[in-house]
Amino acid sequence: MEFRTVVDVPDPGFRIGPCADLLFVGSCFADSIGCRFQEEKFRVTVNPFGVMYNPASILHTVERLSAQQLSPAVTFLTLGTNHVYRLKETGEIVDNCQKRPQTLFIEEELSVDDCADYLEQTIELLRQMNPDVQVVLTVSPIRYRKYGYHGSQLSKATLLLAADKVCGSNPAVCYFPAYEIVNDELRDYRFYQADMLHPSDQTVEYIWQRLTETWLSEEALVFLKEWAPLKAVLNHKPFHPDSKEYQALMDKTMLKVQELQKKYPNFAL
């Protein structure tokens, strides 16, 4: 008997190669998945100007990045909320209130069309950076207690509808169901951290596995297998780092690292 529903992960129509250039922008969930790719030596940029929760702030990050020589092969945009804060004095949406008095800001909720428009602008900028970029939209599974749980669900629904609208009109944009995997497939508090809001490390690892088993190229999967034993040695903290045995192990490991660098030009420690 099957006691859980397994969420289908769609084929994106492309594959992520070994040590590919990736960009992650969005909520703290983007940090979690982006850092997981970093561990596996993909060339990753993660929220370079801090965590961005809403589509407008995600656009602001990409606007700043567009002036830099960055050309990601794949960009993940992780949507956290449709709530934004406008500075009363100027009307601009701010990315961070920077602990300024709350009276200086007006909180608003972006509509589905607002969110979709900000995402479309972001995608256009990304295509200027790399015409062949693949864009992945995902909605963070992290709930927002401060909105109330019903309000949090309404916010997520707005983001889901906006993501669906954008994916439907852009062939090179696809959706990864992280929100659905956590809330429909796992749906158990043992998969959350102590605050009962943020996914646990185990959950992040599960989502990473679901993503990589479908979205990585065969070459990238081979690379992960070759890199895994070397990563284990390099991450190990020896009891006797000055011993001849450990030095011999490190010499052998570094030779294998050099072999990987020859095989995969983008690979770097």
Where are these regions (language model features)?
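Extracellular glycan-modifying ectodomains
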Residues: 1-269
